Each structure stands twice: as C-alpha cells, then as structure tokens.
Amino acid sequence: MNTLFMHCRPGFEGEVCAEISEHAARLGVAGYAKGKPQSACAEFVCAEAEGAERLMAQLRFAQLIFPRQWARGSYIELPETDRISVLLEHLAALPVFGSLWLEVLDSNDGKELSTFCRKFEVPLRKALEKAGRLVDNASLPRLLLTFISGRRVFVGVAEANNSALWPMGIPRLKFPREAPSRSTLKLEEAWHQFIPREQWEQRLGDDMTGVDLGASPGGWTYQLVRRGMLVTAIDNGPMAESLMDTGLVQHLMADGFTWQPKQPVDWMVCDIVEKPARTTSLIETWLGEGLCREAVVNLKLPMKQRYAEVRRLLDRMEATFKARKLKVSIACKQLYHDREEVTCHLRRLDLKPRK
C-alpha cells in the first residue's frame, strides 16, 4: 500500500509529479514521483509502508489541481483465467469496502480496456459481495481497480468523501444540442466540481445576475441562462441568436478586460484566451472590489513550468485578498473538459447575504 496512484490528463504527468512531490515534502512523507509522458497517470512511491495513507489523510483531494483521481495501493499481476480468485486472495488483507469502481486510463489503450471492465465488473461484484468483501455502505472505503491491461491492475483504496466525484474523475455530461459551443461543458463541470449539489438552488438560482466576459458565441452564457439568470454578455464578437431570443441576455460590444458593471452581480464567468497573469489581475479586481460574489475563470497555461505558474498565481491571489483583509475562498482544478488550462472558482465569504 505504499504507492499513491493518480489519473490525469495525458501530457500533464509532470504537473501531477511536481504537485504531489511538493505536498509530500511539506508533510514530511519520503518518496519519489514518476509518470511516463502521455500515459495519463503518475504515481508517488513512498519510502514507508504507510506513506500513501498519510498523504491521503492529510490532503483533501478537492485541493489538488492536476490529479483527476487518486488511490493508495499496489500493482498485482493477473492470470489469463480465474482473475477473480487472485483478486480475492489479495483483498483478504484489506478492509471491507463500501463501493467498487473499475477504472481505466484516459488513453487509447485504456479505452480499449473499458469493454473488458464492463463485462468483468458484474461477476467480480457478485464474488466480492458473496465473500463479504463488498457491502453497500457509503461511509466505508472505496475499492478502485485501475486496469493497465487485462493482466495488470492497480488495486487501490480511497475514501469516497476524499476522492473524485466520478470514476477516473471523468463526468458523464451530455452536450446540449442547443448550446452554441462545446465549451459549455467546462462550466457545467465546474458547477459540479465546486458547488455541492444541495446548494445549487441557493447559489445558482433563477433570481440571480451574471456576467460572461469574452462571451461569444455563448457557450458559458448558455449555462447561466439555463439556470434562469439575467446575463450581460461582454464580447466584440457575435452571440448565438438562440440565446438572444431568450430575453435573458444583454450583449454589449466591449473589452472583457476593461468593462465593469454599474451594480455588483452574483456571478462572473470568463474563458478568455489570455496570459494567465493578466487574467489573475482581472480576478483580483472583480472579487477584490466586490463586483461579483462568485466567479469561475479559466487560466490558460504556459508551455513550461505549468504547475509552478499556477501555484504562483494562486498564492498571489491569496496574498492580495489577505492584504485587503477580504475573505475569499479559492479553488482550482484541471477539469476533464479543460485542455491546456485550469479552472478557478472564487467566492467572497464576507459579503452580506442577498436579500
């Protein structure tokens, strides 16, 4: 159980290694990180047997930026036949589990294995239940089996309340046909990632106002409109007619980096292609001056030192708000629908409740 296994977007293995290594050093967990480029996974091999468990106990998964999913455990080799017996034998030393997820890597090889996993899950689930290794109890640890091939699997453990919301950290969101661009899924995923479902009515209500900076053609505006918000769309480019026809959108031809609302709004969202430092300044202005209560903003990443740059900008925001004596929660994640970017969620915690 001394290895921490993490899924990620292909090409971001180095960022996962840098991020987890920094946390491990801070927490005094000895070990080393490794990740093969484009493999869609990375691991932190701990020097001590309980190292991975310590890391997971002292970190909140939601605070990690680049890992999509994590689990502590080890690899085992499986025979061509009777894989279940070998797995049961290995699991005898582990706790009873409250749920089971079979996972594959987000790679071509992984996608080919997904059919095998679907077929294998039913008999495996039955065998685990019969052996008393799997019960229906959300408070118990989750068993995460990541198949590298039909013969090699990472047998992992994670707490259901401190790991990804979905298998492999990949949400099953359906692209709405009426949305003007696929980028709409980024904002929908952000709602799921950053706002507990039971708070949606309160924090994403139809009595709210929103601003979309760099809105054209309206992929993110669509999500705000879908929640029933009155939206001001800022962009010199055109907006989809279907959105304008709702009567909920006011389109202003202006620069998203200079325009400001006359009255504070509930939400500001922004997916402009710009250097991340400039976008960070925009965030600091909007949250710092109380122009919005909450914001979802994408930071486009540089080619090199991507984790270091994100960390620097997040630390800068935190220091800026602290210096102004403002209470702002800051979260950041590379979402499944993100590309060379990360998504930030910010919320003012010190404003009076809405009337």
UniProtKB/Swiss-Prot annotation:
Binding-site residues, S-adenosyl-L-methionine: 183, 216-219, 235, 255, 271
Keywords, sorted A to Z:
Cytoplasm, Methyltransferase, rRNA processing, S-adenosyl-L-methionine, Transferase
What are the positions of the active site?
300
Query: Localized where?
Result: Cytoplasm
User: Which top-level group of life is the source organism from?
Assistant: Bacteria
Instruction: Provide the catalytic activity annotation.
Output: cytidine(2498) in 23S rRNA + S-adenosyl-L-methionine = 2'-O-methylcytidine(2498) in 23S rRNA + S-adenosyl-L-homocysteine + H(+)
Q: Which is one GO molecular function term here?
A: S-adenosylmethionine-dependent methyltransferase activity
Q: What is its EC number?
A: 2.1.1.186
Class of enzymatic activity (EC top level): transferase
Q: Which GO terms describe its biological process?
A: methylation; rRNA processing
Q: Name one GO cellular component term.
A: cytoplasm
Name the HAMAP family for this protein: 23SrRNA_methyltr_M (MF_01551)
By sequence similarity, the record places it as follows: Belongs to the class I-like SAM-binding methyltransferase superfamily. RNA methyltransferase RlmE family. RlmM subfamily.
- Its job: Catalyzes the 2'-O-methylation at nucleotide C2498 in 23S rRNA.
Q: Which NCBIfam families match?
A: PRK11760.1
Subunit annotation? Monomer.
Protein name according to UniProt: Ribosomal RNA large subunit methyltransferase M
User: Quick one: which gene encodes this?
Assistant: rlmM
